[in-house]
C-alpha cells in the first residue's frame, strides 16, 4: 500500500498539483480534466491511476473511522471532556446503569436484617404512700435566675475564603484548598492533588485522606458521619468551616460524588451558603436539597479547626465524639428513613433511590461497627433495588463486608462491574486483588496490586497486598 501510494504521488499527484498551481484552484469536477491535460487525452492509465488514488483514500478513511473509538478512549478524560458530545459518547463502552445483583443462593444464607424494635414507653403507676407527718414550712431561699439562651442569628457567613474552580475530577483537593484558605494557608488544589491524587484521572479522594493532609500541616480535622443540618449551622457559627461529601445529579444515569464547603446559612432563604468548586463561589443550596444529596454518603463531614480549639469541636459533636455511639445513632437514622420514605424527593433522579441509599447507609454503619454479616445483608438489599454504577467509585464498604464474610466472588463481580465504567480505580483493583489472593490466584492478585500502585504510587494498602503476594511466592 505504501509503495502504491508513493507511486501515485510521484507519477500523478505531483503533475496535477503543478497544473493546479498554474491554473489556480480547481473544483473536484475539473480534476479529471486536469489529469488529462498532464498526461494527454488518450492516456489509458489516467483513469486507473485516479481509481487507485480514490481506493487508497477510501481505505485510509475507513481505517481512521474504525480506529476512532479506540483513539478517543485512549485520550485522558481531562482532554476528552472538551470533545463534542457525539465523540464523547464513543469513549464509553456499554455497561449496565446499576451494579450486579447478588447471587440469591449466597444471599439467602445471610440472616435477614430486621428493623430495630422501638423501646416501649415506660409508664409508672404510683403506689399508695402513707400520709406524711406535718413538717414545718421552710423559708424560701432565692435561687439564681438562669441566663437566657442566646437566639442563634437567622443568617451567618464566614469570610476570608479563596475560591478555586476545580480542575478535572479535582473537587476534593479544590474544596480542601478553599477550606484551608480560611486559616491563611497558601496551598492550591494542584499542590494538594500532587499528594492525595497523583494520577490526574483518579476519581476520588476520601475524607480520611483529606484529614490526614490537614494534620500534616499542623491543623485539626475530624471526620464524622450522621451529621445534621443544625450541627452544620452550629459548627459554622462557631467559626469552623465544614466539608460535606454529597451526590451530584445531572440525570438518572449521570450521577457522581461531589464535595462542597459549607461557609454559612440563611434561614430566611432556607439555604446553606457554600463554596462550590464546580458551580461557583457563595452558592446557595436549599436545606432539603443538600440533606437529600448528603444522605447518599451517610451524611459524612470533615470539620476544619485550629488544634487549640478541638475541645469546642467536641462539645458541639456531643455524644458523636464517641465513634461507636456516632455509628449507632447514624444506623438508627438510616433504619428510620428506610421505614418511612417520603412521598416526594427534591434532588434524586428517581425517588425510589431513597430506600436504596438508605440500605446502603445501613450497610456502611454496620460495616464500620464490625458487624460484617449484617452489613453484607444490607448491601444485598441495596443491590437488589438497583445501586448506581458509580457508587463504588467513592464508597468501598461492600468490598470489605463481602471480603470479611468470605464472599470473594461478590467482591470480584463488583470490582469487574465498577472497573468496566472506569479503569483507574485503585480501590477496586486492591479489593479484587485481595479476593483473588484469598482464592489462591497469586498471579491475578499481583496484577491487581501492581495496577493499583500504577494509579496511586506508594499507596500503602496495595503495597501491603503486594508484600503478601511476594511472601506467598517464596513458599
Regions found by a protein language model. Name each.
Residues 267-365, 374:
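Noncatalytic regulatory segments and standalone regulatory/sensor domains
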Residues 148-226, 298-320, 324, 328, ...:
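Cysteine-nucleophile protease catalytic domains, especially the papain-like/related folds used
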Residues 224-275, 425:
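Active-site-adjacent substructure of cysteine-protease-like catalytic cores
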Residues 81-155, 344, 474-475:
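Ser/Thr-rich, Proline-interspersed low-complexity disordered segments
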Residues 368, 404, 438, 468-472:
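Register position in tetratricopeptide repeats
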Residues 364-372, 380-434:
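Alpha-helical adaptor scaffolds
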Amino acid at each position: 500500500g505504501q509503495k502504491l501510494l508513493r507511486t501515485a504521488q510521484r507519477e500523478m499527484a505531483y503533475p496535477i498539483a503543478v497544473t493546479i498551481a498554474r491554473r489556480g484552484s480547481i473544483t473536484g469536477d475539473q480534476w479529471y480534466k486536469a489529469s488529462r491535460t498532464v498526461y494527454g487525452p488518450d492516456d489509458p492509465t489516467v483513469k486507473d491511476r485516479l481509481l487507485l488514488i480514490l481506493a487508497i483514500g477510501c481505505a485510509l478513511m475507513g481505517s481512521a473511522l474504525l480506529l476512532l473509538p479506540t483513539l478517543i478512549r485512549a485520550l485522558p478524560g481531562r482532554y476528552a471532556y472538551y470533545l463534542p458530545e457525539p465523540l464523547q459518547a464513543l469513549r464509553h463502552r456499554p455497561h449496565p446503569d446499576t451494579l450486579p445483583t447478588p447471587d440469591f443462593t449466597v444471599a439467602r444464607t445471610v440472616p435477614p436484617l430486621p428493623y430495630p424494635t422501638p423501646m416501649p414507653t415506660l409508664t409508672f403507676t404510683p403506689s399508695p404512700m402513707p400520709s406524711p407527718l406535718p413538717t414545718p414550712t421552710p423559708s424560701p431561699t432565692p435561687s439564681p435566675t438562669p441566663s437566657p439562651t442566646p437566639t442563634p442569628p437567622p443568617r451567618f457567613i464566614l469570610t476570608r475564603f479563596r475560591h478555586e474552580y476545580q480542575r478535572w475530577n479535582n473537587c476534593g483537593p479544590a474544596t480542601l484548598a478553599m477550606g484551608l484558605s480560611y486559616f491563611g494557608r497558601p496551598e492550591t488544589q494542584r499542590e494538594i492533588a500532587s499528594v492525595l491524587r497523583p494520577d490526574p484521572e483518579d476519581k476520588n479522594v476520601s475524607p480520611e485522606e483529606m484529614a490526614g493532609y490537614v494534620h500534616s500541616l499542623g491543623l485539626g480535622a475530624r471526620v464524622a458521619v450522621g451529621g445534621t443540618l443544625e450541627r452544620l449551622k452550629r459548627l459554622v457559627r462557631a467559626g469552623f468551616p465544614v466539608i460535606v461529601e454529597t451526590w451530584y445529579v445531572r440525570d438518572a444515569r449521570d450521577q457522581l460524588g461531589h464535595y462542597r464547603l459549607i461557609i454559612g446559612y440563611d434561614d430566611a432563604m432556607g439555604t446553606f451558603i457554600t463554596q462550590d468548586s464546580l458551580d461557583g463561589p457563595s452558592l446557595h443550596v436549599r436545606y432539603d436539597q443538600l440533606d437529600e444529596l448528603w444522605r447518599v454518603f451517610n451524611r459524612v463531614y470533615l470539620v476544619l479547626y485550629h488544634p487549640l480549639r478541638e475541645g469546642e469541636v467536641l462539645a458541639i459533636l456531643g455524644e458523636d465524639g464517641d465513634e461507636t455511639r456516632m455509628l449507632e445513632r447514624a444506623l438508627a437514622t438510616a433504619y428510620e428513613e428506610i421505614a418511612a420514605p417520603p412521598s416526594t424527593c427534591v434532588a434524586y433522579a428517581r425517588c425510589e433511590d431513597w430506600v436504596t441509599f438508605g440500605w446502603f447507609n445501613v450497610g456502611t454503619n454496620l460495616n464500620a461497627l464490625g458487624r460484617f454479616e449484617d452489613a453484607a445483608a444490607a448491601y444485598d438489599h441495596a443491590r437488589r433495588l438497583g445501586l448506581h454504577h458509580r457508587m463504588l467509585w467513592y464508597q468501598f464498604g461492600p468490598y470489605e463486608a463481602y471480603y470479611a464474610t468470605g464472599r470473594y466472588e461478590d467482591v470480584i463481580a463488583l470490582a469487574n462491574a465498577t472497573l468496566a465504567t472506569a479503569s483507574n480505580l485503585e480501590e477496586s483493583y486492591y479489593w479484587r486483588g485481595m479476593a483473588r489472593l484469598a482464592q489462591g490466584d497469586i498471579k491475578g492478585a499481583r496484577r491487581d496490586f501492581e495496577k493499583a500502585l500504577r494509579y496511586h504510587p506508594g499507596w500503602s494498602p496495595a503495597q501491603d497486598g503486594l508484600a503478601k503476594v511476594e511472601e506467598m511466592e517464596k513458599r
